Regions:
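Transmembrane helix-loop-helix hairpins at the membrane interface
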Residues: 171-324
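Interfacial aromatic "cap" segments that immediately flank transmembrane helices
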Residues: 34, 126-140, 209, 251-257, ...
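Cytoplasmic juxtamembrane regions at transmembrane-helix boundaries
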Residues: 111-130, 200-213, 322-326
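Juxtamembrane helix-loop-helix connectors linking adjacent transmembrane helices
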Residues: 92-96, 118-187, 197-198, 202
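Juxtamembrane interface elements at the cytosolic ends of transmembrane helices
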Residues: 104-119, 149, 187-191
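Hydrophobic alpha-helical transmembrane segments in multi-pass membrane proteins
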Residues: 40, 44-48, 106, 134-147, ...
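N-terminal, membrane-interfacial amphipathic/helix-forming hydrophobic leader that caps
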Residues: 1-114, 276-330
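Short helix-capping/hinge motifs at transmembrane helix termini and TM-loop junctions
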Residues: 55-60, 113-114, 150, 154-158, ...
Length: 330
């Protein structure tokens, strides 16, 4: 029996197994999109109110009631406010709200399809937590040269981790808040790689459609349509989709996604309420290509090096074909 090539093998990923008639029902899909987004928005609204209360108190507006909440929201949205309290507030509010919306959506989708939520995370018998750490470590190694090059190109501006506060205590608080980006990456992967890849596969399992469509939807969902940001997110989404299909779960992609976000807010720029629209430069194209290449190399390192597979708790049966170095790419 002929073994499919690397690209074709992605369509046979174990992560796409057991897709049934419920996933193939257009009516049920529309119901999931409408119902899941509705309950997700309700959850996000409630979480916004809850997370804004401590921020309002921290900014000294606690005695002003509803007006105080409005003042805190205005401070959070002010692009000229970048002090420690605001930066931590942006990280906390953004991650909690996004996590709430996406997690509720994924849970609604799983319930509508009569599935356990875990099916959107992994095809392995259990969540491979060590694979998350392997993804975090390898992606950090792959992305560090790109971050360094970006800093050199920008004229080596002050590191956010140092400039956000003058003292060690403030910097530690900032790092602690930035760590919320790890569960945030996990929830994003649960929806945009877990649920979305399986849902697309219910109608078409061709790798180009699976990876291309999920990458475009992932980029569009950030509502930042400036050419440079959209292209970067789309290529990042393609790389994360490749990881998920190749390794049979989102765990490695969670680590890679989290590493990307952490490196940005700690060493490039803090979380911002505004993004400047810029044309796609040659440097941007090179770094985007390097990002995608780094994701591919890191994934194949796990596939092809037995010690990395053992470290990440990856079994050969969970890898899409071809699953060994002697199989010719095709």
């Amino acid at each position: 029996m002929n073994t499919p090539g690397l690209w074709a093998g992605l369509g046979e990923s174990i992560f796409l197994a057991n897709i049934g008639e419920r996933e193939r029902s257009p009516t049920r899909l529309v119901g999931v999109l409408i119902g899941g987004l509705a309950v997700g928005i309700v959850a996000a609204t409630c979480i916004t109110c809850l997370t804004m209360i401590p921020l309002t108190l921290a900014l000294g507006h606690g005695s002003e009631g509803i007006a105080g909440l409005g003042a805190a929201a205005s401070a959070l949205a002010d692009p000229n406010r970048n002090d420690l309290t605001i930066q931590i507030g942006r990280l906390v509010v953004t991650t909690f709200v996004d996590d709430g919306l996406l997690l509720v959506f994924a849970a609604f989708a799983a319930a509508a399809m009569h599935r356990q939520l875990r099916i959107y995370a992994t095809a392995a018998p259990r969540i491979r937590w060590r694979l998350v750490l392997v993804g975090l470590a390898l992606a950090t190694l792959a992305l560090t040269p790109l971050v360094t090059a970006q800093r050199v190109l920008d004229g080596a501006p002050p590191l956010p981790i140092l400039s956000v506060a003058p003292d060690l205590g403030g910097r530690v608080l900032y790092v602690a808040a930035a760590l919320l980006l790890i569960p945030a990456a996990a929830v994003e992967e649960l929806v945009f790689r877990g649920w979305l890849l399986r849902q697309i596969a219910a109608f078409n399992q061709r790798p180009l459609i699976l990876i291309g469509l999920s990458a475009i939807i992932f980029a569009a969902a950030h509502f930042d349509f400036s050419p440079d940001a959209f292209l970067t997110r789309a290529l990042m989404g393609a790389g994360l989709a490749y990881m998920t299909l190749r390794l049979g779960g989102i765990e490695f992609a969670v680590g890679a996604h989290a590493a990307n976000n952490l490196l940005i807010v700690l060493f490039l720029q803090p979380l911002s309420v505004q993004s400047q629209s810029e044309p796609v430069s040659m440097f941007e194209l090179i770094t985007d290509a390097a990002l995608l290449g780094g994701y591919f190399i890191a994934t194949e390192a796990v596939v092809r090096w037995p010690w990395l597979r053992r470290l990440g708790d990856v079994r050969p049966a969970e890898i899409s074909p071809p699953d060994n170095l002697t199989t010719e790419f095709g």
